[in-house]
Amino acid sequence: MEMEKEFEQIDKSGSWAAIYQDIRHEASDFPCRVAKLPKNKNRNRYRDVSPFDHSRIKLHQEDNDYINASLIKMEEAQRSYILTQGPLPNTCGHFWEMVWEQKSRGVVMLNRVMEKGSLKCAQYWPQKEEKEMIFEDTNLKLTLISEDIKSYYTVRQLELENLTTQETREILHFHYTTWPDFGVPESPASFLNFLFKVRESGSLSPEHGPVVVHCSAGIGRSGTFCLADTCLLLMDKRKDPSSVDIKKVLLEMRKFRMGLIQTADQLRFSYLAVIEGAKFIMGDSSVQDQWKELSHEDLEPPPEHIPPPPRPPKRILEPHNGKCREFFPNHQWVKEETQEDKDCPIKEEKGSPLNAAPYGIESMSQDTEVRSRVVGGSLRGAQAASPAKGEPSLPEKDEDHALSYWKPFLVNMCVATVLTAGAYLCYRFLFNSNT
């Protein structure tokens, strides 16, 4: 297959980063004026992940119709997707209002609520303990009917009720729970098995509204999911499956939402998934059983919230190159700590968060084409960290040490100055008396 040869050639030449940069430069750019309005600032998770004006989803609200979501219509594939950010605490009601108004049957979630100790998404669906959630701002009620937990994904059956009309609808929530915090899945097997589960449910069928797909920013993992699905669909529809050009398909999708596919690693993984998925499209039905076997979906799932590893304690008076900290100027140590923060393997997804704790700068293996975070701070801010109770801060200790060191010298200088001034005055007085 031509695509497989292309993949091997790119792998051999190590040119994934260059190809990814070409896509970034060729991608369409359209206005995002509505997203930038001051009143919508608290509805965006990231400053620089915004829906284009021409493709944004509009809520049926009179006061404000804005939600950070984009409609992607792939006409040849006859597939539509709504790509959106992970809901914020203040936009959960808007999220379900969009699902209701767009008549969507499926929601695909590709992140965990917490990753790397950061909140990636609000808990916008009810858990077993509570069973239901009511969104008063949009007058909707969501009830958990059942959930099927596998080793790497969970399928939830939800009931969404419009409290104004008393109408109810079934919503299927497909939650991929094991996308690694750093990078992409090792193998496309589990990803493809998950994708085909979504397909088999009918949630992607045109008789329903567009499937809603999200991660944290709604561009990286979400773009990977939609790109793989669209390419496999085009392979199935065309007489010549090898004519499908992944790069062209991605550029077409980027006309509807910015930044789809965030890293070269995600682009490479998309190729892998399409190449492997094409085996099923070409008639090898046994590969689906292989995906299921390789993905180990019947094993015990990992915990939902994995606490981040503790950060090492900061050094206070430890030796540094054979010398102690107290003999160095304080600002040198502050700079060192700030640099340590920068060197930590932090990642993620585009822009400074507005409504959540800062998300790290994602490496070339996660959702991060433009997302960034400010690490450290000004020197003054670093020195202003509160000391332990009852113990003076490090700058205060240094000041006391410096004062005790210079005190004898300063006293001697003062005495010498007074004696010199006195001698001069006596000389002037005696000189004037003689004249």
UniProtKB/Swiss-Prot annotation:
Organism from which the protein derives: Homo sapiens (Human)
Predominant location category: endoplasmic reticulum
Gene that this sequence comes from: PTPN1
EC number(s) given by UniProt: 3.1.3.48
Record-listed S-nitrosocysteine modification sites: 215
Protein family according to the UniProt entry: Belongs to the protein-tyrosine phosphatase family. Non-receptor class 1 subfamily.
InterPro entries: NR_tyrosine_phosphatase, Prot-tyrosine_phosphatase-like, PTP_cat, Ptpn1/Ptpn2, Tyr_Pase_AS, Tyr_Pase_cat, Tyr_Pase_dom
Tissue: Expressed in keratinocytes (at protein level).
Function: Tyrosine-protein phosphatase which acts as a regulator of endoplasmic reticulum unfolded protein response. Mediates dephosphorylation of EIF2AK3/PERK; inactivating the protein kinase activity of EIF2AK3/PERK. May play an important role in CKII- and p60c-src-induced signal transduction cascades. May regulate the EFNA5-EPHA3 signaling pathway which modulates cell reorganization and cell-cell repulsion. May also regulate the hepatocyte growth factor receptor signaling pathway through dephosphorylation of MET.
Quaternary context: Interacts with EPHA3 (phosphorylated); dephosphorylates EPHA3 and may regulate its trafficking and function. Interacts with MET. Interacts with NCK1.
Domain Tyrosine-protein phosphatase: start-end pairs: 3-277
Identification of the protein by name: Tyrosine-protein phosphatase non-receptor type 1
Catalytic activity: O-phospho-L-tyrosyl-[protein] + H2O = L-tyrosyl-[protein] + phosphate
